[in-house]
Amino acid sequence: MEHMFPENQIENLFVGWIKKHIRNGDLTLFEEFFKTDPWIVNRCDKNGSSVFMWICIYGRIDFLKFLFKQESYPGEIINHHRRDNDGNSALHYLAEKKNHLILEEVLGYFGKNGTRICLPNFNGMTPVMKAAMRGRTLNMLSLIKFGADPTQKDYHRGFTAWDWAVFTGNMELVKSLNHDYQKPLYMHFPLYKLDVFHRWFKKKPKIIITGCKNNVYEKLPEQNPNFLCVKKLNKYGK
């Protein structure tokens, strides 16, 4: 009877219970548990997601500020490099969220040298790629400001953050990046990749790179007709 539940199942139930209180914003209870066991922030559920990750996922900035005050130096207690079963870190989840202030809080606390901005998951996806896929312009610019490399490629498809922004149809992000970095879009998304998308996924991307003659969505800053431009596809892929 003393081993009614496996230890890993008990751990998962406990983290699930803590996760529920994080979602509900019960900071007082969390503070009591933290005083008893500070390493509670690194305990994980069955998916490998730590308590610190769930604080980031639920966007509890009050929890984050409490944790940061408890450390003598960044990373003393919090293992912000911990990854779940898919290889995602807390930064991967923060990069996908709309509230970029939480991402700025974490990046500002751990600093440029205190966290691995370009840490990929098991598919080679970095946080800046996740931000590009979701169209989180402010998140992507914050990550780049703290040292993220937007030209790094994932393992399976060989796409950079620039490629994902174009492929997923995030027009505002594409325009913002092109305006900020003044690079022709054809450098980010070569035409040959369109054929790769078609063969692999049996569908066309939402944005394609086309000539600057007809149905042009937007011209590049240089206004050079020899440059390639962005054209938005309709539902028929034209």
Curated annotation (Swiss-Prot):
It comes from the Viruses. Interacts with host PPIA. Interacts with host PPP3CA/Calcineurin. Interacts with host RELA/p65; interaction of the 32 kDa form with host RELA results in the formation of a stable complex with NF-kappa-B. Interacts with host PPP3R1. Interacts with host EP300; this interaction inhibits the association of host EP300 with host RELA, JUN and NFATC2. One of its GO terms (biological process) is symbiont-mediated suppression of host NF-kappaB cascade. One of its GO terms (cellular component) is host cell nucleus. The C-terminal region contains the docking motifs PxIxITxC and FLCV, which are required and sufficient for binding to host calcineurin. The keyword rRNA-binding does not apply. This is IkB-like protein. It is found in: Host nucleus; Host cytoplasm. A motif (Nuclear localization signal) lies at residues 80-86, 202-213. A motif (FLCV motif) lies at residues 227-230. The lineage of its organism: Viruses, Varidnaviria, Bamfordvirae, Nucleocytoviricota, Pokkesviricetes. It holds the Pfam family Ank_2. The protein exists in a 28 kDa and a 32 kDa form, probably due to post-translational modifications which are neither phosphorylation, nor sumoylation. The gene is A238L.
